Amino acid sequence: MSFSVSDHKNSKRVRSINLKEGDLDRLVFPFKKHSITSLEYKPFSRFSLAKSLDEVFDNKLSQTLVKILNDRETGTAIVQPEINNKKFDKDFLVKLSTGLAYLVGNPNFDSMTGKYYARFSVKHQDSSDSYLRKAYTNLDLHTDGTYVKEKTDWLIMTKMEEQNVNGGDSVILHLDDWEHLDELSNDPVGQQNFIWGSPKSKNIDYKVEHPVFSKDKNGKPTISYID
């Protein structure tokens, strides 16, 4: 296996996957076969891209990702590509992220952008209604997919560039580490249906109804919530 997997320095629940520069070099040619426009309009090309990615890693990368994401003890992976060359530009990162996503499954359609993925900037000032674009706004406890009809199992986010700023790491909390989980997941209110809607920028014109807490296949609590 030509990539390495280790525990993240901050949490054993997070697995770090290191992709070496030499292997990324082998992706440059197959990635150039697919333009960003082609990926946006031809769903099959995304699966083809993912196949090329997996073949570089002897078809072991997909198995590793699926195993990590399906293991409740982890469920999170940080992919760390060794990128020290200008040939690994923003388009390359979009393609790499696309390949990783399609090794796991078929991503949901993003209504906000009208594409299979969303791409945006976090700036010093922002007038939108999206917390994701506001540099100094803390995100409250939430799960993605709360207000859409599609089932949302996983989320992939890619930091493509930083200018005039350092840090900007994502903040995540494993549900089993939440100190209020037992209390709230067993409260009858958490089992009742709530109506969920989204801000205008998301371009979703319907509302959904479901409880905050449900159970997974092993009877452990899951959560679908956004404030």
Spans of features found by a protein language model:
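Preference for protein termini
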Residues: 1-2, 65
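Active-site environment of non-heme Fe oxygenases that use a 2-His-1-carboxylate facial triad
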Residues: 2-57, 72-73, 120-227
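N-terminal, charged low-complexity regulatory/assembly segments
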Residues: 43-50, 67-87, 92
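Well-ordered, non-membrane alpha-helical segments in soluble/globular domains
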Residues: 57-63, 90-100
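Short, charged beta->alpha transition segments
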Residues: 62-66, 143
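A structural signal for short, well-ordered beta-strand segments and their strand-loop junctions
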Residues: 77-80, 110-112, 156-158
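A gly/proline- and charged-residue-enriched helix-loop-helix capping module
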Residues: 98-132
